[in-house]
Amino acid sequence: MPYQTVNGIKIYYEEQGRGEPLLLINGLAFPMDLWFAQIEELSKDFRVIALDNRGIGRSDKPDEVYSMELMASDAVGLLRSLGIQKANVAGLSMGGFISQEIALSCPEMVNRLILVATGMGGPRSLALGKPFWDRMAAAIAGKKPWEIYRIDLTLMTAPGFVEQHPDTLDKAVELRMENPQPLHAFVRQYTAAGLFDSNERVQKIDQPTLIVLGREDPIFPIALAEDFREKMPHATMIIYEQCGHAILLEKPDRLSKDIRDFLKS
């Protein structure tokens, strides 16, 4: 199994395809496996590298303080260990936070930036997302991991999605159950994500940027689109209708196409 030791821990990754490097960074409590549709499709044109962040999947899960800066350093260290000096970087949700941090801390390593179902953190974002987390906390109390994974995907996707796509739900739960996330690791990731705030820094990102948002995302509600428009006016923004937070699962083909078109434009 492919690992690289970065910042003193083992980071699991997979790569597929040839061409310009494309790094895929997933979100809170999501292993890299959930990029399965994008890996399969985008590896036809790019060298796709997907990693498990610290605290999830097959990467190490130290019970210590995490931060977006540290997780960005993990991703950058992985790229450097693979001999990659510059890559396109795509991040979903918390992975979007990490991707922003990479673009800000190591701009010379980022060719183009893709931010999916994410925001800039900070008090406004936390307040808008709080109803989702309150619902989640009430719904998962006392539940087993496989039940939690079904519940969170049901709550974060657009209404009716899991009923219409039961096979997608089953596959996502199965992939997550291969390496269930320990509670301490979830708390470490969640806490780190809650402290992220790029609102006063994001204007410094000058790489070509694609922002993809779901109209019905309960974690990063669509009101945050205006924040992006104000602070990243030169970014390309696409809003998916009838789509919630798990865009990589809800609109897999369209997401792959939009990423490909953006990178080839």
Regions found by a protein language model. Give the residues of each.
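Conserved alpha/beta-hydrolase catalytic His-Asp/Glu region
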Residues: 146-201
